């Protein structure tokens, strides 16, 4: 927990970015969090995420547009994303001098977005899901189509059932969480200390990037 894994992650990430023709320092990133259940070993900073109905900790990630981890922060699951972004990005200016643009989800609206813009001078774009149609909207659309066609209308054609939705830019960080969770140690948060959890995030990414570099 002396920062070795974080430094290895940064060195390998920069090498992969240069290999793909990019600047070693990113100018844009994507932020999201994942709530993970903790085990019975005890430890610091545990809490309950009311939205996900999970008791444990959150893994907060900032990734580049390739999904490579720039910053990782582990904290109590009860900390809302609007506050967690401050914990995640507190060293962003020191480590990522070119960073200027962020994509986030709707959980960061309000004070989280405002803090990143004012304190760090970042441009922050909130990526929204497609709006769910209200009953009134469904009824109006059905009546309009019925009047136009003079026959019954299939509502599933007007409003397809919503399943998994790939969100622009946001899918990149979701894929990173999937990469990390391929490691059995990351299926839950087994650690007593948040710093140990952060080290395992970086270690998982180091493993992935070493394999990529070894293939070439």
Over which residues does each language-model region extend?
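Short alpha-helical elements
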Residues: 1-216
């Amino acid at each position: 927990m002396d920062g070795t894994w974080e430094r290895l992650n940064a060195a390998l990430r920069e090498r992969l970015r240069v290999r793909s023709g990019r600047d070693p320092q990113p100018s844009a990133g994507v932020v999201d969090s994942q709530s993970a259940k903790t085990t019975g070993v005890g430890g610091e900073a545990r809490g309950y995420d009311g939205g996900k109905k999970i008791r444990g900790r959150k893994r907060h990630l900032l990734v580049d547009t390739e999904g490579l981890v720039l910053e990782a922060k582990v904290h109590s699951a009860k900390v809302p994303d609007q506050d967690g972004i401050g914990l995640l990005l507190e060293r962003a200016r020191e480590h990522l001098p070119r960073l200027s643009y962020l994509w986030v989800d709707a959980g960061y609206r309000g004070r989280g977005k405002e803090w990143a813009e004012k304190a760090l001078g970042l441009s922050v774009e909130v990526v929204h899901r497609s709006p769910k149609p209200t009953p009134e909207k469904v009824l109006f659309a059905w009546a309009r189509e019925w009047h136009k066609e003079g026959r019954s209308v299939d509502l599933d054609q007007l409003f397809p059932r919503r399943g998994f939705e790939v969100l622009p830019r946001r899918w990149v960080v979701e894929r990173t969480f999937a990469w990390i969770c391929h490691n059995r140690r990351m299926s839950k948060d087994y650690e007593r200390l948040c710093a140990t959890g952060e080290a395992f995030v970086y270690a998982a990414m180091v493993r992935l990037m070493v394999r990529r570099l070894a293939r070439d």
